[in-house]
């Protein structure tokens, strides 16, 4: 399973939403993510990918779409 597929599955598991057709849609505006959901997502991403998401790098505008989340995780995996 690749990073993209894993992240889409995590989002679906946590929020009961299939976002595969809305990769560039703002997940906050769409009602998929909120502040508590963001914390849950970060914890799960850190656990599954063995990464640390620094609070200083987690801005809503930087992680508000599925594509941005995927890019952020890939970047942290190669840091």
From Swiss-Prot:
Keywords: Cell wall biogenesis/degradation, Cytoplasm, Phosphopantetheine, Phosphoprotein. InterPro entries: ACP-like_sf, DltC, PP-bd_ACP. The keyword rRNA-binding does not apply. Coiled coil: none annotated. 4'-phosphopantetheine is transferred from CoA to a specific serine of apo-DCP. The keyword Cell wall biogenesis/degradation applies. Disulfide bonds: none annotated. Carrier protein involved in the D-alanylation of lipoteichoic acid (LTA). The loading of thioester-linked D-alanine onto DltC is catalyzed by D-alanine--D-alanyl carrier protein ligase DltA. The DltC-carried D-alanyl group is further transferred to cell membrane phosphatidylglycerol (PG) by forming an ester bond, probably catalyzed by DltD. D-alanylation of LTA plays an important role in modulating the properties of the cell wall in Gram-positive bacteria, influencing the net charge of the cell wall. This is D-alanyl carrier protein. It comes from Streptococcus suis (strain 05ZYH33).
């Amino acid at each position: 399973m690749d990073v993209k597929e894993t992240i889409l599955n995590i989002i679906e598991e946590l929020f009961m939403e299939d976002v595969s057709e809305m990769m560039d849609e703002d997940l906050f505006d769409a009602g998929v993510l909120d502040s508590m959901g963001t914390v849950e997502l970060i914890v799960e991403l850190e656990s599954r990918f063995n990464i640390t998401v620094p609070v200083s790098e987690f801005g809503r505008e930087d992680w508000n779409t599925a594509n941005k989340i995927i890019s952020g995780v890939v970047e942290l995996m190669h840091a």
